């Protein structure tokens, strides 16, 4: 019963913040080119969804070494959803690089588009690397990691 309640809360929170993200994107886009507002809403989504289960604890060591005024290029060895939870605890606005298949997931895919994340087609490594390089430079120039 508890897991059913958890999933209902997750769905409700995700839907509310999903709608809020798109409203924020439309309203804030002219003056929020880094998409900080949409990023903040996504942080709330992960904090809420992954903060509900009492057995999930988070600890980020070394966070004091990150300068929020700088842009970083980060590489994650994505082994689990814990990577996503952890990176949203960093004091940075960042963009994901994700395979195009992830964008087909309801709600999640639309949020990634709202973020301005980088979509790659893994069928062509050369094109994917070129896209990451071009779009990555654009976002780094705007101050996003």
What are these regions (language model features)?
Residues 1-59, 110-111:
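A transmembrane-helix-recognition feature enriched in membrane-embedded lipid enzymes
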Residues 57-145:
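Soluble catalytic domains of membrane acyltransferases
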